[in-house]
């Protein structure tokens, strides 16, 4: 009888273990904000109303400005890179929509950051995905939402329009006096074509962006539309009033690759 009494007690003792201690440090993350501010030279960009002048002396207004920002990477003080997960790394900046110019990047590893990299455009991987796949939904959905509303996708030449700049100019040779720059081209689906994807690398000037669980840094990035006309190549509206999927579009892409700069960083 005593053997039957002792058995449960022995079983309880044999199954009792001290709590195991996990010495692994938890991964801490925070957020960083990116604010895109579109300007023309030293002036704030104003749609429709303000008139500007390019480097060759042609007046112009801006009626529409949209561009994709994707594949964001943040450079830490030690040179290592934090890559924003791709599914969270596609944005359509629209001058007509101020909220679209404010990007909040979450789940960023805590630390001090001294630079940023991003792509202007939508990479080939996303561009060749089937439209029904999850990776082509949200901001990249060509059939609904901002991409559809702003007509930022070519159905006739499948691919996204990386940058769309439209406006009026006395120098435009179109019948309605407008200019149209729709720049895209991811390199081709089955054969090599135009590749106007541009990787932008910016260093934070004399400042660092601090990311902690409680501190959020705001990085103000300016995009100077004047650089679209005046960069490695000087663009004349009279000579090129409409540029889309053509060899000449690469000159516009080369120009706008230089339009970004970091103005300041604010720590909240």
Q: At which residue positions do the language-model features occur?
A:
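Bacterial N-terminal signal peptides that target proteins for export
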Residues: 1-5
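C-terminal motif of bacterial Sec signal peptides marking the signal peptidase cleavage site
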Residues: 12-14
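A short, solvent-exposed, low-complexity linear motif enriched for acidic/polar residues
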Residues: 17-268
């Amino acid at each position: 009888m005593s053997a039957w009494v002792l058995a449960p007690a022995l079983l309880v003792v044999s199954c009792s273990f001290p709590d195991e201690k996990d010495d692994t440090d938890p991964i801490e993350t925070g957020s960083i904000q990116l604010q895109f501010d579109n300007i023309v030279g030293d002036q704030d960009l104003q749609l429709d109303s303000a008139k500007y002048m390019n480097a060759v002396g042609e007046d112009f207004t801006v009626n529409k400005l949209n561009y994709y920002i994707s594949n964001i990477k943040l450079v830490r003080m030690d040179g290592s890179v934090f890559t924003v997960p791709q599914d969270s790394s596609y944005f359509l900046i629209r001058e007509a929509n101020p909220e679209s110019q404010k990007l909040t990047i979450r789940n960023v590893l805590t630390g001090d950051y001294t630079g940023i990299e991003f792509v202007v455009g939508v990479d080939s991987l996303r561009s060749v995905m089937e439209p029904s796949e999850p990776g082509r939904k949200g901001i990249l959905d060509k059939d609904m939402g901002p991409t559809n509303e702003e007509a930022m996708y070519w159905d006739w030449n499948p691919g996204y329009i990386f940058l769309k700049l439209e406006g009026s100019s006395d120098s435009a040779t179109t019948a309605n006096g407008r200019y149209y720059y729709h720049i895209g081209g991811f390199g081709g689906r089955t054969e090599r074509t135009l590749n106007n994807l541009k990787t932008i690398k910016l260093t934070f000037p004399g400042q660092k962006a601090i990311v902690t669980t409680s501190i959020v840094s705001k990085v103000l990035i300016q995009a100077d539309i004047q650089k679209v006309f005046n960069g490695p190549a000087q663009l004349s509206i009279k000579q090129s009033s409409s540029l889309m999927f053509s060899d000449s579009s690469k000159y516009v892409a080369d120009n706008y690759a230089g339009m970004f700069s970091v103005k300041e960083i604010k720590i909240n």
